């Protein structure tokens, strides 16, 4: 099921805190702190997200304090 009607905001950030049940505190590029959970594809492929990792986060325009981690960026990559 895809969400084509809702325009999601995609940003990059750094994981600052690892919480329980696949939840993470992420500091975005603009300085905001959001609570983000791991997307299903990352969970299914057993991709580990650790403290200090750069990640791509999707935010809903309705709640800018919660997000979904959609991609773990490689170390040293700019995008």
Swiss-Prot record:
In terms of superkingdom, the source organism counts as Eukaryota
Does the keyword RNA-binding belong to this entry?
yes
Keyword entries, A-Z: Chloroplast, Initiation factor, Plastid, Protein biosynthesis, RNA-binding, rRNA-binding
Q: Specify whether Protein biosynthesis is a keyword of the entry.
A: yes
Q: Which Pfam families match?
A: eIF-1a
The signal peptide here is: none
* Family matches, as CDD domains: S1_IF1
Protein induction: Constitutively expressed.
Q: Predominant location of this chain?
A: plastid
Specify the S1-like domain's residue ranges.
1-74
Instruction: Name the SMART domains on file.
Output: S1 (SM00316)
Listed under subunit, the entry gives: Component of the 30S ribosomal translation pre-initiation complex which assembles on the 30S ribosome in the order IF-2 and IF-3, IF-1 and N-formylmethionyl-tRNA(fMet); mRNA recruitment can occur at any time during PIC assembly.
Please state which protein family the record places this protein in: Belongs to the IF-1 family.
State its role: One of the essential components for the initiation of protein synthesis. Stabilizes the binding of IF-2 and IF-3 on the 30S subunit to which N-formylmethionyl-tRNA(fMet) subsequently binds. Helps modulate mRNA selection, yielding the 30S pre-initiation complex (PIC). Upon addition of the 50S ribosomal subunit IF-1, IF-2 and IF-3 are released leaving the mature 70S translation initiation complex.
Q: What is this protein called?
A: Translation initiation factor IF-1, chloroplastic
Q: Which organism is it from?
A: Chlorella vulgaris
Q: Which gene encodes it?
A: infA
């Amino acid at each position: 099921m895809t969400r084509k009607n809702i325009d999601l905001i995609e940003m990059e950030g750094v994981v600052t805190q690892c919480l329980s049940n696949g939840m993470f505190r992420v500091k975005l590029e603009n300085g905001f702190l959001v609570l983000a959970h791991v997307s299903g594809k990352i969970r299914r492929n057993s991709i580990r997200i650790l403290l200090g990792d750069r990640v791509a986060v999707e935010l809903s325009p309705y709640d800018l304090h919660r997000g979904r981690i959609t991609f773990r960026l490689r170390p040293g990559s700019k995008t």
